[in-house]
Amino acid sequence: MPAIVLIGAQWGDEGKGKATDLLGGRVQWVVRYQGGNNAGHTVVLPTGENFALHLIPSGVLTPGVTNVIGNGVVIDPGVLLNELRGLQDRGVDTAKLLISADAHLLMPYHIAIDKVTERYMGSKKIGTTGRGIGPCYQDKIARIGIRVADVLDPEQLTHKVEAACEFKNQVLVKIYNRKALDPAQVVDALLEQAEGFKHRIADTRLLLNAALEAGETVLLEGSQGTLLDVDHGTYPYVTSSNPTAGGAAVGSGIGPTRIGTVLGILKAYTTRVGSGPFPTELFDEHGEYLSKTGREFGVTTGRRRRCGWFDAVIARYAARVNGITDYFLTKLDVLSSLESVPVCVGYEIDGRRTRDMPMTQRDLCRAKPVYEELPGWWEDISGAREFDDLPAKARDYVLRLEQLAGAPVSCIGVGPGREQTIVRRDVLQDRP
């Protein structure tokens, strides 16, 4: 059976955790394929319990599902162990969590360099989370990174860490005037942490492909969003990995022909965290309303998210670069009680109108949104479970977004709970 990729179609924080949780009871595997603990998924169970996950796939909250941290993820061992402990303390069974032997480990020098670099950059900083994600991916590309499997060979691990620290300490001490790290202490701390997770290390590529051959369903769960992709996002204000659908194959070891459905998660308005262009950003009472009503604060950083109206240019772009087959529209309920809801249908750049994503960041920074005004609705829609339960104006809003976004809206979120979802098309049953 083909795999399903679940991706964020904006700048992240679209509600991917809710979508994974909704589908989790009907799949056998959930795989996190990129990123690190620089992003978070919030899942609200039918019991009302709220879980914030940063490294572990959202499927861990569904009994019987095997969860995988794939080779494309960078793992902070301390964060992993704390997250596992937090889940276990709340009665969650984590026995079926596996970790790819080829995932990279985030080391103390990655965090140190990330933090001092951001401070050094000052007003020109990217706005990272300061968790060492970028420096860890830099080492991966430079072929000097530490992989999960290295903890199984202490001698090899020691050689690698000593070589890395020799260079990293030069940077920390001579450029940033910080203290040098002791490689022996780094190794000892890592080996101690590894005792808590090394029994989970596996050849996950082999297991995932065997599962697909056996007819099992694999859900590939991305973090962040399309516009934060290092290749396809608003560079340089991006993450250091590929949250797009193409990254799912690379970060899991599943071939692209194994993927049959790409489910894009799309918020009914737009948000982003950190620096970078944001054409529909609001600085008035409407932005304040979206922030407060949508509870737009980062799961990982706690930072307030920037808020703006829905941007169809971005949605079409996401559909194009990901090959999105279906959209899951989230937080439609947040728009209730607005008299009208503007939707960005295009940009104006130096007097020229376009419906497409600008080729350069310079043009995107100068883009002015061209709005189409849609009528709002006042009804509380949080109890709607069928599309026809929605007020006519809310249905019209969804249908207009569907026309503009480049793919059908198959699911609609009308609240944070798993059950607060309208399913127009079953993306698991009605599949290629």
UniProtKB/Swiss-Prot annotation:
It catalyses: IMP + L-aspartate + GTP = N(6)-(1,2-dicarboxyethyl)-AMP + GDP + phosphate + 2 H(+). This is Adenylosuccinate synthetase. IMP binds at D13, E14, G15, K16, N38, A39, G40, H41, T129, R143, Q224, T239, R303. It is found in: Cytoplasm. The lineage of its organism: Bacteria, Bacillati, Actinomycetota, Actinomycetes, Mycobacteriales. The active site is at D13 (proton acceptor), H41 (proton donor). Its cofactor is Mg(2+). One of its GO terms (cellular component) is cytoplasm. It is an enzyme of class 6 (ligase). PANTHER family: ADENYLOSUCCINATE SYNTHETASE. InterPro entries: Adenylosuccin_syn_GTP-bd (IPR018220), Adenylosuccin_syn_Lys_AS (IPR033128), Adenylosuccinate_synth_dom1 (IPR042109), Adenylosuccinate_synth_dom2 (IPR042110), Adenylosuccinate_synth_dom3 (IPR042111), Adenylosuccinate_synthetase (IPR001114), P-loop_NTPase (IPR027417). GTP binds at residues 12-18, 40-42, 305, 331-333, 413-415. One of its GO terms (biological process) is IMP metabolic process. The modification N-acetylproline is found at P2. Mg(2+) binds at D13, G40. Homodimer. Belongs to the adenylosuccinate synthetase family. Plays an important role in the de novo pathway of purine nucleotide biosynthesis. Catalyzes the first committed step in the biosynthesis of AMP from IMP. The keyword Acetylation applies. It comes from Mycobacterium tuberculosis (strain ATCC 25618 / H37Rv). Its EC number is 6.3.4.4. Keywords: Acetylation, Cytoplasm, GTP-binding, Ligase, Magnesium, Metal-binding, Nucleotide-binding, Purine biosynthesis. The keyword Magnesium applies. Gene3D superfamilies: Adenylosuccinate Synthetase, subunit A, domain 1 (3.40.440.10), Adenylosuccinate Synthetase, subunit A, domain 2 (1.10.300.10), Adenylosuccinate Synthetase, subunit A, domain 3 (3.90.170.10). Binds 1 Mg(2+) ion per subunit.
